[in-house]
Amino acid sequence: MEGKTGVLVKNTTSDVWTWDNPPEGFYKATAATCTQVLTFAVGQEQPVGFVATCMSVDPDGDVSVSLLTPHPDGALITQTSGTGKWEAYTGVEWIGGTDIQIDANTSTYSWKATD
């Protein structure tokens, strides 16, 4: 989507998330599908901002939905809803970012608690 002063790029990815020191009963890694919207100023290669909505289902079938926003250390992920073991983590935030960019639509990310 193009405007006079900028461009919006929408991208959907299939990723692997790893968790630093996950709580007991949680998996070290989960799969996530994210829809990202990146904002670029005209003529710039680096985005000026982004937001992403991510959906995840762990191996037990518990689900979560999270919102990713920019953070000085990479990205801030805030869980907006969850079921099963994830239900108690609604509103919790983690900080992390890309570890490996596998291709244009697949990456691995690692997350750690904000406190």
List each language-model region with its residue ranges.
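Beta-strand-enriched cores of mature, soluble protein domains
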Residues: M1-D115
